[in-house]
Amino acid sequence: MAGLPVLYSFRRCPYAIRARLGLRAAGFQPGVSVELREVDLACRPAELLELSPKGTVPVLALPGGAVLEESLAILDWALQQHDPYQWRLAASAEPTTAALASALLAEADGPLKHHLDRCRYPERFGVRDP
């Protein structure tokens, strides 16, 4: 799969999920137009750490050597390549649409992520099942 972008991901990471969803929405298909490498976060591969010393996911390595380390940057890049639903055009033409998209992303990064973590990892936060 030489020449394809490579996405380093972890299936349960919400930011990696967002990157995978963004790539799929832009028409990228794992194994066809993007290589997906699931990472064991307990044993991060050396090539991931070479690309991104912080070792977090998602990371998208582009064929030209550029590296994207944030899910929103990956989403933006994917939609720059192919935007089948014209989301970028709609956002640029309609400020209200862009503001709504930003507000939804902020909600997903803030309160939703806070509660999602407590639901998925209750032992980390001392949460007991009612």
Tell where the protein language model's regions lie, with residue ranges.
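GST-like domain detector, emphasizing the conserved glutathione-binding G-site
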Residues: 1-130
